[in-house]
Structures are given as structure tokens and as C-alpha cells.
């Protein structure tokens, strides 16, 4: 049975690259009717926080990614200690008492010579008695894995094919820190083995970790899982996606009014393309049905804010059920304008749904329905050219209407045009300035026909 895992570290908000990794791991498990495991990798005591863990969990739920099993590495330290001891007892690991300042000095010397640092194995051959004496005296230590000399580690990557790496360059690497906490490459192996993970899908930055992990699997007698290393995501300038490219976290898009279905859709097609899909708008169910790891492109994917913005607009305009759209919009609008009547909002959404691509954009574009706005500079300039009597005429005409509709507003404008020398454009501009404070935005006949009549008259009164 297929078992995949997503193993984020709670050291920051979830990056879009991590989210895509989680989505691909999720799709692979669901496509094969397997199990999807969420594991929080919080062994970095200094940088891991509960706030970021909660954020990751919340963002995954928001994206619609549900897991079957949940683990937290900080609750498994006793297990890691047990397996570290097994490696020591079997001769695959050893205590290292080298001082950190000496290691740092060696590292600096290697860098100065243009070489990568490799631990020289100083403590590799200490006698059992020497080790016991130093442990009894309370001397600080780390535990290092003993890397076999002259070995080539090979594995078949599900995306890249065969990868072979000479492990001689690694040196004996640390698996347990001096504070007793275990290192990523060690705990990832223990957890993946004990959780019976069959397929590990992760970013290509982990390729160099894989040989180290395979050595640990072999030393403990575990069968390694299959590995798939995803290509990196680039910004539109073809450099690795980072904060300088703008929003790069799931949290950013959530807070800026994107809907989860659109972000899920965009990320799952970022580097994955299938002839079976053949379209840019795809549901989670379709993604599960058609997902094949072999269809992942080996070349880096380019993240486009514009493409995601467009796709989100498609979801808002055409795909989201009205009740979901209302619910999502309501939360954004009430943050900006206070309590919003749901029936009033239904009228607004019915008439304006095609006018915005994000909820945050909707907050600004729908402002005239909830709050008066001060005139912008263009509106001020236009107002200076308008005969102020038009506002009084508009007020009189609208007062006489039983209700305001787009059709009878045309009649209002026509009546004013007949009784004055004003052009229709001037009358419409006057109405727009009074109601919205701007010459741009949603059609003014739509705004005027949805706003309560008394509110329309009140705003006109400011200019009479």
C-alpha cells in the first residue's frame, strides 16, 4: 500500500514550494488509494514555534489537504535516542568529543583553501575505555554516523532516473547534536521507516541528503522508500522563488483574498502537465484522478503572479457556488466595513461578480456600496468643470422615483438633458462623483440601483 508524507518544519509560514510538495505527495497517495501522513519536523528547538505549526496546519486545511495520520517529531525523542544507540552498538556511529571551536577553525581553513569541509574522523577510532571515561566525566559530545570509505550510493529517482553520488566527500556527519536533539537526516530516516513510508516526494534541494539517508537505512536494516525530487520553482526573472518576488507564502495569498481552490489548482499544475487533463482549470478530484509522478517536468517551473491572479478571477466569476462566494466575501467586507446584511450582499454579488479577481480587490471596488469615499484627484478636477445645479436636478428627479433601476436612471438623465444644456456624459459623471468619489469603477447605474434610495439622496445632497 502506498504511504506518502509531507514533513514541513514550523520555522516560518508555509512557502509555495513546500505547499506544492505537500499537494503532490497528497495527490500521489490519493491517486493510489494510499495513506497521506502529516509530520511536523520540529527538532530545531531554536527556530520551531507553535505559531508556525498552527499556521501550517491551518493553511493545509484551507487548501483542502486532509491527512490520515499526524505526528510531531518533538514527541518522538526517545525513539531517536533508541536508534542512535543501536547505530553506536553496531559500530555504525560513534561519540565525537571535538570542540565546536576546533571544528569551526578547521571549516574556515578548508574554505580559505577553496575546499568543502570534511570532518577528518578525529574521534572515529577512540577506544571504548576512552569513550566511557569521557562520558562519565560529563564531557560534551555529538554523535556522528560512520560513512563507509570509497562507497558510491545509487538510487533510482522517480522523476530523474538513476542518481549516483560518491559519499567520500561527506565525511562522518552528525546525527545527534550536543544538546541531545537529533539531526534531520537521521530522524527523517527513523520516522519514514517506522511510519512505513513507501514514497518520499520532496524538493531537489534534498538530493544531496538522500545518499546519507540511504546509508542510515542500510545500517539499520531498513528498506529505503522510493524517492522523487521535484524541480525548483523560479520567479519570472528565472531566479529561485523568494521574498523579493513578492508574496511567496500560502498565508500571503489567503490574506490577500485568493480562494483556496484557485491556489491549489495553480500549484498542482505548476510543473505537472498531463495530456489527460488538457485544461488550466482543474478540480481537486480531477487532479487526484489524473496525477502521475512521471508527468512532472524535469525543468524548473516558473511562478506567475499574473497567471494566478487570472485563475483566481475565473474561480470567482464562474466556478465558486454563490453561497461560498458570499461567505468568503462577507469575512473580508466585514473586516473593512463592519456588519454587512447578507441579503444586501446577495444583490451586490449578483450584479458585480465579474468585476474583481480577488476578495481584497472586491473590498475596494465594492466600497461605494458600504462607505462614502473622498474625491480622488481626477474626480476633483472633473467636479470643477460641472455645473453644480446638476446635483440638485439629480436629487429632484431621483426623489420622484418609486425605485431606482438602470432603466429609469436613463430616463432621469434624459429629462435633465432636455431641461438643460448638459450632455448625458456630464450628468452621468456628476452622479458617479457624488456616489463613488471617482470616475472609475463598477457601472454607476448598477451602484445607484442597489444603494438604498435614501443613501443616494444623502450623497447627492453633499453637492447641492
UniProtKB/Swiss-Prot annotation:
A GO biological process held by the record: glutamyl-tRNA aminoacylation
Sites where the protein binds ATP: 243
Keyword presence, 4Fe-4S: no
Keywords of the record: Aminoacyl-tRNA synthetase, ATP-binding, Cytoplasm, Ligase, Metal-binding, Nucleotide-binding, Protein biosynthesis, Zinc
EC number: 6.1.1.17
Cofactors (names): Zn(2+)
Catalyzed reaction equations: tRNA(Glu) + L-glutamate + ATP = L-glutamyl-tRNA(Glu) + AMP + diphosphate
InterPro entries xref list: aa-tRNA-synth_I_cd-bd (IPR045462), aa-tRNA-synth_I_codon-bd_sub2 (IPR020751), aa-tRNA-synth_I_CS (IPR001412), aa_tRNA-synth_I_cd-bd_sf (IPR008925), Glu-tRNA-ligase_bac/mito (IPR004527), Glu/Gln-tRNA-synth (IPR000924), Glu/Gln-tRNA-synth_Ib_cat-dom (IPR020058), GluQ/Sye (IPR049940)
Residues that bind Zn(2+): 96, 98, 123, 125
GO MF terms held by the record: ATP binding; glutamate-tRNA ligase activity; tRNA binding; zinc ion binding
Protein family according to the UniProt entry: Belongs to the class-I aminoacyl-tRNA synthetase family. Glutamate--tRNA ligase type 1 subfamily.
NCBIfam families (alphabetical): gltX_bact, PRK05710.1-4
UniProt name for this protein: Glutamate--tRNA ligase
Gene: gltX
Amino acid at each position: 500500500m502506498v504511504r506518502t508524507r509531507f514533513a514541513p518544519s514550523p520555522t516560518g509560514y508555509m512557502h509555495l514550494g513546500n505547499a506544492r510538495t505537500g499537494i503532490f505527495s497528497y495527490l500521489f497517495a490519493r491517486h493510489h488509494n494510499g495513506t497521506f501522513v502529516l509530520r511536523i519536523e520540529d527538532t530545531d528547538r531554536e527556530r520551531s514555534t507553535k505559531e508556525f505549526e498552527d499556521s501550517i496546519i491551518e493553511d493545509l486545511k484551507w487548501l483542502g489537504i486532509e491527512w490520515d495520520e499526524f505526528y510531531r517529531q518533538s514527541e518522538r525523542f526517545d525513539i531517536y535516542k533508541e536508534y542512535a544507540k543501536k547505530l553506536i552498538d553496531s559500530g555504525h556511529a560513534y561519540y565525537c568529543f571535538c570542540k565546536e571551536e576546533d571544528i569551526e577553525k578547521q571549516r574556515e581553513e578548508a574554505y580559505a583553501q577553496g575546499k568543502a569541509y570534511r570532518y577528518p574522523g578525529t574521534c572515529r577510532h577512540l577506544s571504548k575505555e576512552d569513550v566511557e571515561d569521557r562520558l562519565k566525566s560529563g564531557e560534551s559530545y555529538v554523535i556522528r554516523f560512520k560513512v563507509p570509505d570509497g562507497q558510491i550510493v545509487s538510487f533510482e529517482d522517480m522523476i530523474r532516473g538513476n542518481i549516483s553520488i560518491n559519499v567520500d566527500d561527506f565525511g562522518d556527519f552528525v546525527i545527534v547534536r550536543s544538546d541531545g536533539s537529533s539531526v534531520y537526516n537521521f530522524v527523517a530516516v527513523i520516522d519514514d521507516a517506522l511510519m512505513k513510508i513507501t514514497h518520499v516526494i520532496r524538493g531537489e534541494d534534498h538530493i544531496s541528503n538522500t545518499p546519507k539517508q540511504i546509508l542510515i537505512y542500510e545500517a539499520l536494516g531498513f528498506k529505503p522508500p522510493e524517492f522523487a525530487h521535484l524541480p525548483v520553482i523560479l520567479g519570472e526573472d528565472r531566479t529561485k522563488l523568494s521574498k523579493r518576488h513578492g508574496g511567496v507564502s500560502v498565508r500571503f495569498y489567503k490574506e490577500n483574498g485568493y480562494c483556496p481552490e484557485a491556489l491549489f489548482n495553480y500549484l498542482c499544475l505548476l510543473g505537472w502537465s498531463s495530456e489527460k487533463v488538457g485544461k488550466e482549470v482543474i478540480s481537486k478530484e480531477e487532479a487526484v484522478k489524473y496525477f502521475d509522478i512521471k508527468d512532472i517536468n524535469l525543468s524548473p517551473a516558473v511562478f506567475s503572479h499574473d497567471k494566478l491572479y487570472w485563475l483566481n478571477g475565473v474561480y470567482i466569476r464562474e466556478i465558486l457556488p454563490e453561497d461560498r462566494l458570499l461567505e468568503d466575501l462577507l469575512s473580508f467586507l466585514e473586516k473593512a466595513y463592519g456588519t454587512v446584511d447578507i441579503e444586501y450582499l446577495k444583490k451586490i454579488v449578483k450584479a458585480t461578480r465579474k468585476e474583481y479577481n480577488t476578495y481584497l480587490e472586491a473590498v475596494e471596488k465594492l466600497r461605494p456600496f458600504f462607505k462614502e469615499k473622498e474625491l480622488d484627484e481626477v474626480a476633483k478636477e472633473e467636479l470643477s468643470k460641472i455645473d453644480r445645479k446638476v446635483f440638485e436636478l439629480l436629487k429632484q428627479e431621483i426623489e420622484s422615483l418609486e425605485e431606482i433601476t438602470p432603466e429609469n436612471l436613463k430616463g432621469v438623465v434624459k429629462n435633465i438633458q432636455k431641461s438643460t444644456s448638459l450632455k448625458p456624459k456630464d450628468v452621468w459623471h456628476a452622479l458617479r462623483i457624488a456616489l463613488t468619489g471617482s470616475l472609475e469603477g463598477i457601472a454607476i447605474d448598477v451602484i445607484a440601483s442597489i444603494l438604498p434610495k435614501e443613501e443616494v439622496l444623502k450623497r447627492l445632497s453633499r453637492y447641492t
